[in-house]
Amino acid sequence: MTKTNILSDNCVLKRKKIIDKMRDRIKSPCKKILLVQPVQITEDGIDIKIALNKRYYMYPPYSLGVLTTNLKKRGYDVSILDLNFDLFKIFFENSTESFLNDRITDIWKKRLEEKIKNFEPDLIGLSCTFTMGHDLLIRTADFSKSINPKIPIIAGGVHVTNAPEMVLKEGKNIDFISLYEGDISFCDFADIVNNKKSEETLSQIGTRIDKQYIRIDKRTAPASEELNTIPDYDNLSIGEYNNFGEIGTFRYWRNKDAIGSPVLSNKGCRARCTFCSVANFNGSGVRGRSVKSVVDEIQHLKEDYNVDHITWLDDDLFYNTKRTLSLFEEISNRKLDITWDASNGIIGSAAVMHEELIHAASESGCIGMYFGIESGNDQILRKIKKPSAVKHFLKLGKLMDKYPNIFTRGFLIMGFPNETLGQIYDTIKLSHEMNLDWYTVQLLTPLPSTAIYNEMVEAGTIEGGSLNIDGEGFTMFSVRESERQRRKERQQKTNAKEFHNMFKNNLDRVPTKSELTELWLLVDYLINYQRIIETNDRVKLKKLQRFLTDVSDRMTIGNPISNLFLGIVETKLGRNIEADRRKLLAKEYISESKYWQTRFDSLNLMELL
């Protein structure tokens, strides 16, 4: 790893070096700026059948929309290119699988080349939010330079901020990186190039000079009125995104024909969880937009794009109780007739301490909430600095039972450093006591620039600089854990090993990484599926029916467990013909897979068929 130079050391000299490089690489006047969202999943990671089932996430580039608004206010000619949307739209227009698999790379490259040649930008900005997008960020920069080597390229986003040196080291064609929130600093960067702003205002910028990484760490984060920015999506078809993928995680529970779009009401999070990169990117604390600005944006989406479902991007939606209540009340008062979900997660303790927030949320159209739980063991929760304890989660479960219209889900993580089997089992027990509608169980993926990542590097349990881009990450764009299990199944169909119940052995033992991978299916089964056998509440059963139908028919086609337990749910609801059909499907899928035969035997599920 190269030595990092931060501005505080001989700041004048370092600023001068960066400014000199800016003057050399970016010609003035610089007026036309192309903002690009690269494809989010590598070609070999895209399954066309999954894509056509709208399984991959398809969020509009919200941050680029905000940046476009701010740049246009300063007089710049801005255009947005969303290569991810354009690629997936072509999937649906040309759904011949063999044709598409051979042409994925050609499709996005052709679209990018056309845009660069037609728009003729003076500067290209690339966005990368998630670690798994690292490779495509680099390749997008490389291809852009091959079209016109004279166009300077600047990259920004959460991943770029978390792994800046690696982005610049591997991205030879990336001239500069924009660190942290670029809403203001990127605009200042362009103004400095055009001699419209003092060089001393340069902030949040990094580059490589003489093989050394140099950055200006001083932040120019948007505050007060600067936060009240409604995204300008240029010519993007915001109302169509929902047609080609997921926005949020509650498609099965919202209106069938709902058109979704994301909205951000505040930035940052009060929590300091050791596995989370929010504080590194947004800084400490939470900064909220005005209620009027947020609801104006929702109304704009409704009127201009026919959006009637909102997914909040907030990492701490319930921060500032008074403001949050006002937000929900204003949504209700304007009679916008929308629904919304909180897919990014709600802090459990914030919900139970202010029950009025849940009531107001329900009244304003909330249909789904995720809660960040992570672990059912207080020792682990303290170690990872969660702002909630087991007692809060138990109260939360009882609270949410009062709002059956809201589909409740919980985030759970396995594999924290030195986490024992007993502590993982505590998470299983807590999930049963809380009795949320469903839980997402994931293996820990330490993100660069987080406290837990640094801890694990120092302990030698992971290698420093590893980006872990195999799709297992805790990100909106990653393939879900259930799909990771499908990949594992394909790899092990012929030699699936015996599946052991590790919780019958020494619970004080820390499982190995390979054991954790194998353990995931068992934990997911014990947390989500096993309790269905004892569930008789018709409201819960109706929720499970909707969810498991979506899992079985769209999310993970060929999954015998989801079909079996959907059959059990259908039996309890008195739909015996459908129940028999689902169980027959489960038998069919099991017969085709040694992997599933072994696991059904180990879980004693064959007797349920």
Where are these regions (language model features)?
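Glycine-rich beta-alpha loop elements in corrinoid/cobalamin-binding modules
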Residues: 63, 70, 79-87, 97-224, ...
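TPR/TPR-like alpha-solenoid helical repeat scaffolds
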Residues: 595-609
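Radical SAM [4Fe-4S] cluster-binding motif and immediate context
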Residues: 59, 225, 233-414, 421, ...
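N-terminal [4Fe-4S]-dependent radical SAM core
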Residues: 2-33, 39-51, 94, 208-262
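Catalytic cores of alpha/beta
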Residues: 166-170, 357, 418-432
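Short catalytic helix/loop segments, enriched in acidic residues and glycine
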Residues: 51-69
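Proline-aspartate-enriched helix->loop->beta-strand connector
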Residues: 120-124, 307, 436
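C-terminal accessory regions of radical SAM enzymes
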Residues: 2, 34, 39-54, 206-219, ...
